[in-house]
Regions:
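Alpha/beta-hydrolase superfamily serine-hydrolase fold, recognizing
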Residues: 68-73, 77-302
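A glycine/proline-hinged amphipathic helix-loop "lid/cap" segment
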Residues: 1-78
């Protein structure tokens, strides 16, 4: 069942301005063709910028370390209230985590009163899902051993949301216990992208470019393979899931199809905000973003 959430009057105005700004920015045109996206991927293969974040201006204690080949940034509240830990997979797949994703992780840690670790996984096109899953499994096994698997939750946005969902099958095949839950914001639920795509209604995402990125991420796997695709992944390996998205984004139809998958529909809660842009939860000025973050914190503390 989908729970639709109407926007406040203030959000209607703010969202209208954000949609206009997005259209004028030309961001969608940048990845509007497969050929242009493949050119960008070729450039990234030659020169991928390193992950070197500015780790100041956060509410929590910030620490960094390397797990396998991934850099991890952990936000730990000065007063930890619950014995849980969240592994956060930032969206991007081909780009390093952004400042807003770091601030988001910091905010969730502060509100949930538990550590949140942002995993800066290896990126396509130089690497693929397999390298990222190996890093995720190493970190997850460590935390599950310390806290118990039921106290470790996976969280991700966009492409990172697809990792949070599909990596559960990898954990199961590696003999690791099921995580305590998954929280996914506007995840890519079908790596092949379904046929019911709201291309015109989304001023940010473009299907041709996104397909090229996802193909690169999947490496030698077909995008329909359950090893990389949440839509065909083993349902029993995926724990209770909270999905948050907009009903106006390109990915919405696939998110809905995933939420009613056999074996998942009774364990999946989907909240869809009316008319917002992809990535709305990062804009702290939106009432909808505040609401989404409250739902995330409630799920973590459950």
């Amino acid at each position: 069942m989908i729970h639709y959430i109407e926007l406040s009057a203030g959000d209607v105005l703010r969202n209208g301005f954000r949609r206009l700004t997005a259209r004028l920015s030309g961001a969608k045109r940048l990845l509007s063709s497969r050929e242009r996206t493949e050119e960008i991927l070729a450039e990234l293969r030659e020169d991928q910028p390193p992950f070197s974040p500015e780790l100041t201006g956060f509410d929590n204690v910030v620490s960094t370390r390397t797990v396998a080949s991934a850099q991890c940034v952990t936000f730990t509240p000065r007063w930890v209230e619950i014995k849980k830990h969240v592994i956060y997979f930032p969206g991007g797949l081909v780009r390093q985590p952004t400042r807003e994703q770091l601030l988001f992780a910091d905010d969730i840690a502060a509100k949930a009163r538990c550590p949140v670790t942002l995993l800066a996984y290896p990126l396509a096109p130089t690497y693929s899902y397999a390298d990222a899953y190996e890093c995720a499994a190493r970190l997850y096994a460590e935390l599950a051993g310390q806290l118990g698997a039921e106290n470790v939750l996976l969280m991700g946005d966009a492409g990172g949301g697809s990792i949070a969902l599909a990596v559960c099958g990898y954990f199961a095949r590696a003999g690791l216990p099921k995580p305590g839950g998954v929280i996914a914001l506007s995840p890519v639920c079908d790596m092949s992208l379904g046929t019911e795509i709201n291309e015109d209604g989304d001023p940010l995402l473009s299907a041709p470019g996104l397909r090229a990125i996802l193909k690169s991420w999947c490496g030698f796997r077909f995008p329909t393979d359950g090893a990389v695709n949440p839509m065909t992944a083993e349902a029993d390996a995926i724990p209770d899931t909270l999905l948050l998205c907009s009903d106006a984004e390109l990915l919405f139809a696939d998110i809905c199809r995933f939420a009613v998958r056999e074996g998942l529909r009774r364990r999946t809660a989907l909240h869809a905000y009316r008319g917002l842009l992809h990535g709305f939860a990062f804009d702290g000025r939106l009432d909808a973003a505040k609401d989404a973050r409250e739902r995330i914190v409630d799920r973590i503390r459950k």
